[in-house]
Amino acid sequence: MNIAVIFAGGTGVRMNSQTRPKQFLELHGKSILLHTIEHFEFHPDIDFIVVACLKNWIGVLKNELYRFGIRKVKWIVPGGETVQMSIYNALQKIEENEELSDDDIILLHDGVRPLIDQQLISRNIESVKKYGSGITATYQYETAVTVDENGYFDEVIDRNIVRIAKAPQSFYIKEVLEAHKKA
């Protein structure tokens, strides 16, 4: 079984939106969150989706899922105080309601990251099967530096040895559950 957990429990403070959290900002008549969900909805290898959402926005999300015919979202759980807690809330819901096997895969994805495609989801699933995990990463193109205790540039980091970790991040679900319980 391949399960997508989409976390969207944050308020988007840095975005400074006065009207709604950034995951519910609209683009072409749909929320950013729905654009993200659709990638997993339409992927043939994703069995179901769990969304961790701001508690006061769950009703809005349910209406949007219904309006656009989204069928793979099995549960919407309240988001937590942190991303980790939002993911853990979703994991607990899955564990309470599903008979999990050792080969069940979970893809963890940020609800405000809709710029993914079917191939990336497939590569994450295949990576878990081959290596035990799959973490999306891209090259570091910008110059990165370290700073000293005064905030002054100290050293330029060789970008050839740096990658930027992104989402989805994918694992065997039992391993993620165990790690979250220890955290």
Map each language-model feature to its residues.
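Residue-level signal for inorganic ion chemistry
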Residues: 6, 33, 90, 110, ...
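Conserved core of the sugar-phosphate nucleotidyltransferase
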Residues: 115-183
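Short coil/turn connectors at secondary-structure junctions
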Residues: 1-2, 102-103, 130-132
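N-terminal glycine-rich phosphate-binding loop and ensuing alpha1 helix
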Residues: 2-59
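Conserved N-terminal catalytic core of the sugar/cofactor nucleotidyltransferase
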Residues: 34-103
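Short aromatic/hydrophobic "clamp" motif used to bind/position activated sugar donors
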Residues: 106
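Short glycine-rich anion-binding loops that position phosphate/pyrophosphate groups of nucleotides
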Residues: 10-13, 56, 82, 111-114, ...
